[in-house]
Structure formats: C-alpha cells, structure tokens
UniProtKB/Swiss-Prot annotation:
Cofactor notes: Binds 2 heme b groups non-covalently.
Cofactor(s) in the UniProt record: heme b
Quaternary structure (record): The cytochrome bc1 complex contains 11 subunits: 3 respiratory subunits (MT-CYB, CYC1 and UQCRFS1), 2 core proteins (UQCRC1 and UQCRC2) and 6 low-molecular weight proteins (UQCRH/QCR6, UQCRB/QCR7, UQCRQ/QCR8, UQCR10/QCR9, UQCR11/QCR10 and a cleavage product of UQCRFS1). This cytochrome bc1 complex then forms a dimer.
Localisation: Mitochondrion inner membrane
Domain of life: Eukaryota
Protein name: Cytochrome b
Pfam families tied to this protein: Cytochrom_B_C (PF00032), Cytochrome_B (PF00033)
Amino acid sequence: MINIRKTHPLMKIVNNAFIDLPAPSNISSWWNFGSLLGICLILQILTGLFLAMHYTPDTTTAFSSVTHICRDVNYGWIIRYMHANGASMFFICLFMHVGRGLYYGSYTFLETWNIGVILLFATMATAFMGYVLPWGQMSFWGATVITNLLSAIPYIGTNLVEWIWGGFSVDKATLTRFFAFHFIFPFIIAALAMVHLLFLHETGSNNPTGIPSDTDKIPFXXXXXIKDILGAILLILILMLLVLFTPDLLGDPDNYTPANPLNTPPHIKPEWYFLFAYAILRSIPNKLGGVLALILSILVLVIMPLLHTSKQRSMMFRPISQCMFWILVADLLTLTWIGGQPVEHPYIIIGQLASIMYFLIILVMMPVASIIENNLLKW
C-alpha cells in the first residue's frame, strides 16, 4: 500500500517540506534558526491572541488593561512577559539567521533572500507597533519620535505624518490603528514565511562549504527534525529563564509610567533590537539624511548579491572576509551600545565613526577583501 503521507494532497505538502525533504548532510547549528523563527512566530501569535482578549486599545484604559492582565487574569503575567521577551528572542534568532546568510553566501538564492528582507522589515514594523500598545511613557514618546521621522519626506511629509496619526498628535486614533495593524501583521509574516520556504525548497538549502550538495543529501525527518527540537528546547529554556527570573531585564523602566504628552522622558530610546539602527539615525545631524541612513542600514541587505565579488560562495575558506565579517558584528554591537547612551561628547563621535564603519565594511571592505582573496588564490 502506498503511504498516505506521500499521496494525500495536504500531507504531501507537509511531507515534501518537513519529512522527505532532501537536506545537505553537513549543515551546522546555524541552520536551526529558520525553524526557531517559525516557533517564535507561532508563540508570539498565540500569546498575542490571549493578550488581545483582555487588552483595550484606548488611551484612557490601555495602560490599566495591561496592569489588569498582569494582576487579575489567570497566568496573565506569564503570557504578557512571554510575549514581550518572545519578541527579544525573535530578534536574536533573526539577527543570527541573517548573519548566517551573510557568512555562508546564502544571499545568492535571490528570491528567498529578498522575501527574507521583506520579512525583516515586516517584523520590525510589527515590533514597533506592539511597543506602542502598553501606552507607557516610552511607548508614547517612541511612537511620537519614530512617526515624526516621516515628516522629513519633502513636500508630503507633514500630511503623511498627520494621516498616520489620525490627528495632530499621537492619540486615540493612532493607538487603535496600531493595535489593528499589530494584530494583522503577524499573519502576513506567516504567509510571507511560507513563500520564503517555497522559494528555498526550489533550490534546496545552502551548506557551510557553499559547494553544491546534490550528491550528498539526507532526508530531513528524524535527522534534522530532532536537531530542530533540540534547538527549540534551548530557545524555550532561555525564554523561560528570562520570563521567570528577569522579565524586565530588556524592557525600559519608563514604560511603567503611564503616557503623558506633557512630560518628555530624559532619554527616549527604542527596545534593544532597534538600538543599532537608532544609533545610525542619530549619528547624522540632518533629519532627512538620518532617515535615509536608517532605511539604508537595513535595505543594504538587498544589494548583498551585487557586492559579492568572490569566486567562492561561502566565507568558510576565506580568512580575510571572515575578519571583515566579525569586525562588522563588533561594529553592530558598538552601535547597539551607542544607541542606548545619551547624546553627549564621547558617544556622539563613537556613534558617527561606527555608522561610517558599518557602511564602509559592507560596501567597500568586504568586496575588496574578496578580490584580494581571489588574487591570492590566483583565481
């Protein structure tokens, strides 16, 4: 009898994606992050759904409703903190996943890569809108500062900002629309993730060597599935350690003060996962220039395939490029640190230098390093 797994129209799709999928035999733990991102997304949708049952998107009651969830709803506190820290885990996995793609040359799968960049933007937008919902001080002022950046767009800027606000400032209309968008976006992300996977399965996975692995493939199930489960256990372990021991470690204490349009917090800063981009934004004294640099800092990922000058795909056998890659990682960590610091003497210049370094490494130093390596290998 033919296995139903291989014949049933629905089971067949699942089978070809997660069970009988031919996987390279040498993929390392850096290939775990795709499945971990899927788990993060499911977790965020589920916890978010239960939070939405008790949350009220209204300026007068939003803050109180979050307090009510934490105090009065059964296990509301754990759902709330799983959702908040789940976002941090989501972004850790995202950065690792993108970093893996850069290191091993996975960006040569153009469709998969471009959908991935769109996914990154969508996730960042969702996280930003979610941060506004508790309606604390940092929620309100974060929303004010970031939406205001659109006013830097020539001619239509001011109208655009007021259209997004639904008024002349961040208010009730802004909160309700952000809640609506924050609810719908994860489902759009889930749909895009399926398209991401569809394009990936057209070519098959890359592997650490960057050499085609068609001659040496193994079935996904039992081998890579167990490995994914191990990754998931570790992910949930780290998440629950955060949630149960230090739930507010990554949050901002200002967000425990209800939003007050008349009182600006001394240091407005986003969640830690946006600090690198925030530092790049702040390092340029011009408003429009800063906004462009902010967008380009992420959009630069789209042109990575064009900047690939090496004859090899992966960085596994390219020590100079490896050095460049890890300098870039160090630079991003520096930017993250600077983004959380006040705009004062040593930090301003460090931020500006780190921002210049960021674009210099990606646009100049990495392609040049690749050319040098090609010449050293006489290729």
